[in-house]
């Protein structure tokens, strides 16, 4: 019997790597995608190149994965891992002065939106096709790496917040529509214990643990999976202050 497949878009050194490692330890074949081939590939994983700034490449990625490995039963959309102040951010963001977020030009906004949202739309559609081809015993789970920016604007990161907000809506819509089919859609959002934005201290290992748990659940849970490292899922009140300032 062949191993189930987890397809991870955005194979960064923090979340992407730890999620892949967690699933491989549970018997999955992990297929990681990134714009450039890794300089030091891990022999435990398989790799496919793809550029999330071009939504059409997502379709090509799924085609390659199906041809080489089979239908993915878990799809993790971790965006395009960039680096800022030596920390991984699981998305595309073009920073601006907080006093002038709309200084961003249209091509830059479109590029970031493609990575954060438009390619997510394509990935969801392709995942639905894969899930329909899999048996009911398969996980059939789609996970989008989120954060608290769909609740509050954070100065200087408007393109990221716009993408996260739109993608959160798509995940909520998919979770509601496809739960009767046994498909699951989640927007995990790591928080500090007081409910504030996880920020640059997010834990790849904590993400990996909750992603694996969500893949194992038999039915759709809350699409918004706010969680705290070492605790797991926490349902914060709607009026929780998510800002990073104290």
UniProtKB/Swiss-Prot annotation:
Protein name: Short chain dehydrogenase/reductase dmxR12
Keywords recorded for this protein, A-Z: NADP, Oxidoreductase
Active site: 164
Recorded metabolic or biological pathway in which this protein acts: Secondary metabolite biosynthesis
EC number(s) from the headed UniProt entry: 1.1.1.-
Family: Belongs to the short-chain dehydrogenases/reductases (SDR) family.
Domain of life per record: Eukaryota
Annotated positions binding NADP(+): 15, 34, 125, 164
Residue ranges the record marks as coiled coil: none
Function: Short chain dehydrogenase/reductase; part of the gene cluster that mediates the biosynthesis of the dimeric xanthones cryptosporioptides. The pathway begins with the synthesis of atrochrysone thioester by the polyketide synthase dmx-nrPKS. The atrochrysone carboxyl ACP thioesterase dmxR1 then breaks the thioester bond and releases the atrochrysone carboxylic acid from dmx-nrPKS. Atrochrysone carboxylic acid is decarboxylated by the decarboxylase dmxR15, and oxidized by the anthrone oxygenase dmxR16 to yield emodin. Emodin is then reduced to emodin hydroquinone by the oxidoreductase dmxR7.
Bilayer-crossing regions: none
GO MF annotations in UniProt: oxidoreductase activity
Entries under InterPro entries matching the protein: NAD(P)-bd_dom_sf (IPR036291), SDR_fam (IPR002347)
A Pfam cross-reference name: adh_short
């Amino acid at each position: 019997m062949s191993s189930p497949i987890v397809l991870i878009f955005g194979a960064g050194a923090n979340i992407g790597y730890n999620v892949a490692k967690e699933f491989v330890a549970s018997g999955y074949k992990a297929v990681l995608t990134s714009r450039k081939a890794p300089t030091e590939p891990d022999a435990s994983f398989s790799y496919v190149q793809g550029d999330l700034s071009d939504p059409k490449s997502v379709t090509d990625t799924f085609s390659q994965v199906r041809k080489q490995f089979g239908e993915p039963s878990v799809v993790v959309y971790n965006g395009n891992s960039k680096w800022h102040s030596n920390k991984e951010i699981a998305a595309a963001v073009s920073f601006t002065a907080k006093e002038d977020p709309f200084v961003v030009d249209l091509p830059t906004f479109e590029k970031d939106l493609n990575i954060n949202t438009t390619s997510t739309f394509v990935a969801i559609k392709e995942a639905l096709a894969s899930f329909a081809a899999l048996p009911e015993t398969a996980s059939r789970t789609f996970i989008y790496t989120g954060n608290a920016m769909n609740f509050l604007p954070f100065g200087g990161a408007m393109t990221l917040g716009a993408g996260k907000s739109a993608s959160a809506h798509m995940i909520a819509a998919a979770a509601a529509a496809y739960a009767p089919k046994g498909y699951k859609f989640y927007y995990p959002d790591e928080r500090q214990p007081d409910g504030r934005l996880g920020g640059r201290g997010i834990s790849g290992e904590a993400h990996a643990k909750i992603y694996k748990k969500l893949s194992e659940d038999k039915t759709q849970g809350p699409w918004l999976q706010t969680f705290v490292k070492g605790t797991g899922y926490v349902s914060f009140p709607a009026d929780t202050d998510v800002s990073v300032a104290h």
